[in-house]
């Protein structure tokens, strides 16, 4: 059975990559494509916009008008928009793949609640490599975490609006959970002025925003005399797009529940 996917933010950098990934994936077709009200891209053919050829899918700003054209929605936009799309999907009983980052606790709670009704894959990063890194971080933290300083450094393009990145925060959460720590208590997100000595149980974050960096993350487990670094560099957004479409195909078999890429990739077996 062919899965019909809708993409919101279809005209953005990630949206165009998602359209391309859908067009390259067997068993998946683009059913609908959406942009914000007032966008100059409304009415354009989504395939032509993404340089994959004419698809006959016009970009619109009205989810309700296209509700019969898609089975699942992929959303890599902003929290306020994603939550509005989430409410629509719950009402229409359509599953969602959510790659949006920057949610506050209330937003995350709404996603959790929605998963009682529909299937949701919610992840800070859809790269297969990054999700493998999450498992490596857990193993490193188990062996070294209580005896070394842990620092997370991330870099992204100048247009990214949230910091630290959702991926960096997820890395911190995986480490903190392994060590029995609360990231809200032990995470250090700014250092300025006379900060005093570093506490051993801190998990530090550093953020870089520059140019067109797609996404780079490095985690240090630093002890006196040695340092282990676990790093990931993305050179194309296509890695995230392909992962999201892979998640969509996997989620098509689920009625409801909240999942992440660990579930999609079956990484709990490692």
From Swiss-Prot:
Coiled-coil zones: none
Cellular location(s): Cytoplasm
GO MF annotation terms = 4-hydroxy-tetrahydrodipicolinate reductase; NAD binding; NADP binding; oxidoreductase activity, acting on CH or CH2 groups, NAD or NADP as acceptor
Asked if the record carries the keyword Endoplasmic reticulum, the reply is no
Please list the residues that bind (S)-2,3,4,5-tetrahydrodipicolinate: 157, 166-167
Keyword Electron transport in the entry? The reply is: no
What pathway does this protein act in? Amino-acid biosynthesis; L-lysine biosynthesis via DAP pathway; (S)-tetrahydrodipicolinate from L-aspartate: step 4/4
Provide the residue positions that the database annotates as binding NADP(+).
36
- Give the annotated active site: 156 (proton donor/acceptor), 160 (proton donor)
UniProt-annotated binding residues for NAD(+): 9-14, 35, 99-101, 123-126
Family of this protein = Belongs to the DapB family.
- What name does the UniProt record give this protein? 4-hydroxy-tetrahydrodipicolinate reductase
Q: Which gene encodes it?
A: dapB
